[in-house]
Amino acid sequence: MFRDPTAGWLTPPSPLSLLVMLLLLSRVGALRPDELFPYGESWGDQLLPEGDDESSAAVKLAIPLRFYDAQFSSLYVGTNGIISTQDFPRETQYVDDDFPTDFPAIAPFLADIDTSHSRGRILYREDTSGAVLSLAARYVRTGFPLSGSSFTPTHAFLATWEHVGAYEEVSRGAAPSGELNTFQAVLASDESDTYALFLYPANGLQFFGTRPKESYNVQLQLPARVGFCRGEADDLKREALYFSLTNTEQSVKNLYQLSNLGIPGVWAFHIGSRFALDNVRPATVGGDPSTARSSALEHPFSHAAALESYTEDSFHYYDENEEDVEYPPVEPGEAPEGHSRIDVSFNSKADPGLVDVGTSSPGSDRASPWPYPAPGNWPSYRETESASLDPQTKQGRPVGEGEVLDFRDPAELLDQMGTRAPAPPEADAALLTPVNEDLGGRNTQSYPEAGPVPSEPDVPVPPLEGEVLPHYPESGHVPPLRGGKYVIGLEDHVGSNDQVFTYNGANLETCEHSHGRCSQHAFCTDYTTGFCCHCQSRFYGNGKHCLPEGAPHRVNGKVSGRLRVGHIPVHFTDVDLHAYIVGNDGRAYTAISHVPQPAAQALLPVLPIGGLFGWLFALEKPGSENGFSLTGATFVHDVEVTFHPGEERVRITQTAEGLDPENYLSIKTNIEGQVPFIPANFTAHITPYKEFYHYRDSVVTSSSSRSFSLTSGSINQTWSYHIDQNITYQACRHAPRHLAIPATQQLTVDRAFALYSEDEGVLRFAVTNQIGPVEVDSAPVGVNPCYDGSHTCDTTARCHPGTGVDYTCECTPGFQGDGRSCVDVNECATGFHRCGPNSVCVNLVGSYRCECRSGYEFADDQHTCILIAPPPNPCLDGSHTCAPEGQARCIHHGGSSFSCACLPGFIGTGHQCSDVDECAENRCHEAAICYNTPGSFSCRCQPGYRGDGFHCTSDTVPEDSISGLKPCEYQQRYAQTQHAYPGSRIHIPQCDDQGNFVPLQCHGSTGFCWCVDRNGHEVPGTQTPPGSTPPHCGPPPEPTQRPRTVCERWRESLLEHYGGTPRDDQYVPQCDDLGHFIPLQCHGKSDFCWCVDKDGRELQGTRSQPGTRPACIPTVAPPVVRPTPRPDVTPPSVGTFLLYAQGQQIGHLPLNGSRLQKDAARTLLSLHGSIVVGIDYDCRERMVYWTDVAGRTISRASLEAGAEPETIITSGLISPEGLAIDHFRRTMYWTDSGLDKIERAELDGSERKVLFHTDLVNPRAITVDPIRGNLYWTDWNREAPKIETSSLDGENRRILINKDIGLPNGLTFDPFSKLLCWADAGTKKLECTLPDGTGRRVIQNHLNYPFSIVSYADHFYHTDWRRDGVISVNKDSGQFTDEFLPEQRSHLYGITAVYPYCPTGRK
């Protein structure tokens, strides 16, 4: 056995076990402990120190290792079953949390492991020995027969956890648990790719999860996490891409019982590549245990089986967990339905290195789906290398029976035995790997420190019937290399007798350049003549269009018709067609509205109109495929129906036009011809039937005849018709032929129904379908409910057949539940989506879509949003034809449209402007001199007068006494007589009662205002123009983030033109706080004013004389003022209860005192299609309010019986989450994590106002203290989480708490204790503080995953995502007192308390 002698296993390995491990022959028996990769200190392993949270020093790698799309030169090994490319944070930051982690992680068994007191050991090393690399290569090639067929690793990194135990808080006198785990991770890489192997030997896993330290005594055990995480991308600050294999205890147990490459306990994954790799891709070559030699295994060997028992806590949505389905080549003798067994046989008459792993014919003991060479084609290793197995066989002779081998050091022995497995040949020569080895020993490859390794021969594969052998290029003409493979373009030489292929690599479409043409749920595969798309596991379709398996689907379309019904012509155009398909039992319902009555009645028997959807989405029997798996969402369906005996003939053409933005199929139907007349009182009855569909290239045909009956009372007539169907589509011609479906399939229609409702004007069809092989009449046999649709799975769940009539149900991707009841998952609210920066996630039923924000559009990959290049603006790029900048301004109207307007002081068309001579208009004082300047003018008082030129006074000084006056009083008294510069303003200072300067000074005649210091000096930058809000004489306001307006840009342009400081006689536009033109504009600092419109144009006839202001009307309508509604008298409630949000419903949970009355809990309101997150209650009008992130709305409903919901806000929302009601002021407040805003509005949705839109990253919870007028909210920004506060009108914003918090999800204010309390999903604590942030204390520090919290009486109640319930916590003791788990197990969001009265509290 391959163990370090210190491991305690002293039995030497046998030659048989060595060869078995080297050659890796798949079999269904579980992995034995001695079949792990060799490890131990004698193999060069390093030991990790004992402890609970240890990590290795950086292990420098010889060559960089690729992980996802990056390269790393060092690795770290941690105690807790994890490997990373960077040093680990403290274990409390990741060991008890679900994926994804914040750092890169490779986790074969992430749990709280403790090796203290010699409880196991952890070993790791980098290895380049040929034996280890060869074994890793064989695993990879087995699991990835296409993409990994030429994988030749050059380095491997091994980490082994041997007999390690879980962390335990052992009580005094109790012995530690004897449950110990052994598992191994191997990372094999070459220059281009990295593959990971996880190995779990039989009985190697004895514990399957650990209990979190912070809540160790709560009896909560977290299953081990197995998978990979890329880590947070620093440049994008988005959550990490990840792949998870486990989520429940059963899925952890499956690790050693199942496999994704056919060997129980061995799992393989493609985790890094220098080519595009959207996510980790698991191997998909699992076998079937029904033929396995292990009676203990009861589940299929498949990745899907390993992921059974999903729960919402760790549901891994398909966009985050894209599986690359590999299609292994199938030989002509493939075992039925893929069930196979691979055995190992040793040829005692041949070289001991020769091993037979051939593929046998069906029915033999060695039937295998993997195309290994036949026994006669296996390579014979050279004698010099074979002889090294035993020093006694110096000539390399075979070891005879009864001879005993003398084993030396295992490393030396395995290095000399190193070999690589031959790559599986492709039947269609799809991939041609470079030939660099042969049996003669030429071009042998040497592994470092391992000596030469036997080369692989090219194994000839017998051609299939009708197949043409490829003509390989001669030496020196090597085909181009792409993606680590040689890809050859093939061209037929028609008419050539030798029928050879030649190679043409020009213009070949490849995945690298065309991957965007595949569905987002598909992977792309290069073939010799091009590429094809294939849907991932758990999806079906043609690769270009993929839908989730088992999920319901919808079809929308239009129907037009030109019919003759009997002898009556009937026409109709573009009437609506809608179809609903229950995917997991093959039911298809079709409804066509607004068809004229005679035509609708006559079309009742024409079932193929809706029967198409039955064939498209039929329930598939094993080995069969429905229509959508073949055609995808683009095809043409032609039907010709001939009625008998009248020979009426009608033709139906249905054209599928792809999937719409909601992922629904769009179809256009046209009906033309003649149909028999059917009276209005007759109904049509169609018995179950079978149809045969024939498949060839890109055409499907079907021809059948059947009868139907028309009944009315006692009348029963039987008619018949003949149906010819033809379905054409575009198949991918590049895929190998062995991927084709059977030539003929049978569609069985168990139930058929047709009905026309004249009252509704709707024609309906319903069919229940299953498709499978052609059946031969025989005695009836039991059918698994999954195949005939009789199962009890939810309509959004997949049915997994088991043995006999047993089956299991699993919710399809995008839904959650136990399979018998599934609800939609909001990927947008939970963060499980791939929408990138500058995009918005929109939740759909069973899925989601990404929309670019305003000003952005999708790039070619349809995921990334890029900035839309703005249209040219002639006003900015200088292409306008306006007069020069100092004379006119350009006004942009969108696109390339603009207009020109002369500036004040100029007159003209805007394209040509001339100066206005203001002096000719006598605008100055009679004792002043006027000076005209381009675009303006100035006035100066004549000698002997003082003033600003518009007002001049005689230059005389009063003789009043000035003794005893303070500076403000002095300046105030003698303002008119102080020295004034030409054009200066006369301002009379304002003083307070003590004679000091009032901080806010305003010019009495012009309305200019500014701030002054204690000496009366103006504070720079505080002056405001007339008509605007006076400045707050304190700290300057925060800079605005909005774009500059025309007024602001014009003002800045003139200020720059004036050199930064305009004279008092120069005009500067006056703008309000929002950048709009103030209706009243004045010249310089004078009171010579006029009115302007919203674009700043002067309104003719509004200029005034000095001292008189024109009455200017604002161009923006004032806000509507509505009266506050009078509070109605509400009868007292019978008690207090809790309301909680749970996706599509609002739940009601009564309280008896502070105890939960769980038996009286019920659903208060069902809201189909909604995702209710935030919830609060208006105690004055007994109304409940909630936010809906699916509908992007805020709604309310009365608690009176029979009340209907009312939507009050329907626009301007992206992801409304937190909600708070102020019952005093009749207002509501909410957070929007999509827009990063906090808004307020009246309770009817009016008077909306954005309070904050800056310095917010992930705002969530919000609460209000209406008595004291304070607002509080949380922001769970991972880099800087915080709790903030402000007044209710948005003033005095400040950070209240930003230390020692992680993910503050829930927030509540207790009006009785005046405490602000929050529940933190990061620190797992419930804490409280006084409103000013002081007196902070911890109530409970062992929460699981809280989302929302509310306070009532002596308890807190919070919703919990780990328990999916409501948890109650005593305020005084901090103890958990009770919990309520709703019958429908899904995440609970917001929670609020409904009092029988309005709480008043005390100031």
Swiss-Prot record:
Q: What would be the name of the gene that encodes this protein?
A: Nid2
Q: Output the InterPro entries linked to this UniProt entry.
A: 6-blade_b-propeller_TolB-like, Cueball_EGF_LRP_Nidogen, EGF-like_Ca-bd_dom, EGF-like_dom, EGF-type_Asp/Asn_hydroxyl_site, EGF_Ca-bd_CS, G2_nidogen/fibulin_G2F, GFP
Cystine crosslinks: C511-C524, C518-C533, C535-C546, C786-C799, C793-C809, C811-C822, C828-C841, C835-C850, C852-C865, C875-C890, C882-C900, C902-C913, C919-C930, C924-C939, C941-C952, C968-C991, C1002-C1009, C1011-C1033, C1047-C1071, C1082-C1089, C1091-C1112
Pfam families associated with the record: EGF_CA, G2F, Ldl_recept_b, NIDO, Thyroglobulin_1
Domain EGF-like, by residue range, is: 507-547, 782-823, 824-862, 871-914, 915-953
Where, by residue number, does the polypeptide cross the bilayer? none
Q: What GO cellular-component annotations does this UniProt entry give?
A: basement membrane; cell surface; collagen-containing extracellular matrix; extracellular matrix; extracellular region; plasma membrane
> Which portions of the chain have biased composition (kind: Polar residues)?
386-395
Which segments constitute the Thyroglobulin type-1 domain? Answer: 965-1033, 1044-1112
Q: Where is the Nidogen G2 beta-barrel domain?
A: 551-781
The protein's location, in the record's own words, is: Secreted, Extracellular space, Extracellular matrix, Basement membrane
Q: Please identify the protein, giving its name as recorded.
A: Nidogen-2
User: Where would I find the LDL-receptor class B repeats?
Assistant: 1182-1225, 1226-1268, 1269-1313, 1314-1355, 1357-1401
Q: Where is composition skewed (Pro residues) in this entry? A: 1027-1040
Q: What does this protein do?
A: Cell adhesion glycoprotein. Might be involved in osteoblast differentiation. It probably has a role in cell-extracellular matrix interactions.
Leader sequence residues:
1-30
Primary location:
secreted
